């Protein structure tokens, strides 16, 4: 595990996903039923319908992503961002856009069993949903030693044979267990009961646990989650840049944000604003130069 000390923890992108069955109920005489039935025959499973709900979330061909949490370490605090959406395609598009902003050639993905589950599941669901994935998930053609992943399950396993659960590792290291009210087998049921907020909290606890496992393996003390802050002005600018409508409400948000900025940040914001009245990524922005002048002077 000494290799962990060679890298800056701020270059790590921590990821965890929670998955559910792709449909709330497996219907007989459908292509999905036939495919799952074949899987059951191959694995000597008798209860085709019953097994689907508990086991389908383990396979990208039969499950779907309920939410994805990404975490990063900034100023010795954990910063979290979670993506959840009933429309899985939109969820994956938003997620890949966020990864594109963070990831570079120094980025390491980190998670527990990320090489065997999270990363390939994301890759396959992107392909199924026709979503362009970030290249950091497209690793099937790479040599194993060039894949930029740190898997805490493999780091803990070392040269042994057994892979330990995240709960086992956190317990052994004296860290809080991420599994408080339920475990992964309950996610499918909770998802279709509409309890996505509970799933999100569960997912975020996993990411926090992995961050602190890595900290301890590096010989460092555990850290806490940063308190949530208001949306950064860049979020509003990005919304306009991507073709979002420039409304009176957005104008007020921008005015308030600019008024609170330092001189340096204000100059950067103005620089961004001045390039907005143009076609951005194929979309026509609705803000005008007159609007920008009013913002700067207001």
List PLM regions with ranges.
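Conserved non-catalytic scaffold segment of RNase H-like nuclease domains
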Residues: 2-124
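Interfaces that engage single-stranded nucleic acids at replication/repair/recombination sites
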Residues: 231-298
